[in-house]
Regions:
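Active-site/ligand-binding-proximal alpha/beta "capping" segment
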Residues: 1-13, 17-19
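Conserved short-loop catalytic and cofactor-binding motifs
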Residues: 4, 26, 126
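Alpha-helix C-terminal capping segments
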Residues: 17-22, 141-145
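Mobile "lid/hinge" segments at catalytic clefts and subdomain interfaces of large enzymes
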Residues: 22, 26-35
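Active-site loops and adjacent core secondary-structure elements that bind or stabilize anionic groups
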Residues: 35-41, 45-168
């Protein structure tokens, strides 16, 4: 616990926030993954960055520091066993924009605390919210079965078929 407290960075996020706040005059980047985007912006704008670009980078910077703070906040809630804190911070990394939300006219995306859900789509169209809902429902049901012993079929988050291998 004391090692975690010692490693909480206060100065870095403060500098990032200050730069992001001053996006009218400052371009802030928070990741080496943004280098190429910044270089392209500078090349396309005679060595400068546009206000739209600076606003976008500011948004990403504030998102990054908010994410960092959320991880710390949730850590303290976990060690204090605070099941229902006054403010709950839900955070995640964008994994994938989905084909559509619960209904075709709605947008949706999958976020995760990790960078990968360890799900591989083998065939078919891009998944929708309903497809992911079915996947997670099937996984929840299958976890109650003995390992490698059965199959679960789900439609609209409702199990419509479960089989168990009698030889298991």
């Amino acid at each position: 616990h004391s090692k975690i407290i010692e490693n909480i960075d206060v100065g870095g996020p403060t500098i990032v926030r200050a730069a992001a706040k001053n996006y009218n005059d400052v371009t802030v980047i928070t990741s080496s993954n943004q280098y190429e985007t910044l270089i392209n912006e500078l090349e396309n704008n005679k060595g400068s960055t546009s206000i739209d670009f600076r606003e976008k980078m500011s948004l990403e910077a504030f998102s990054e520091t908010a994410y960092y703070d959320a991880v710390i906040s949730n850590y303290f809630n976990k060690i204090k066993k605070t099941n229902f804190p006054k403010k709950k911070i839900i955070y995640g990394n964008l994994i994938e924009k989905l084909r559509y939300g619960e209904n075709p006219h709605q947008e949706a995306a999958i976020y995760s605390k990790t960078q990968n859900l360890n799900i591989e789509q083998i065939h078919g169209k891009q998944l929708s919210y309903n497809n992911y809902n079915d996947i997670f429902s099937a996984l929840t049901i299958s976890k109650s079965l003995p390992k490698n012993s059965g199959t679960v079929i789900v439609k609209h988050a409702n199990p419509c078929g479960v089989s168990i291998n009698k030889d298991s």
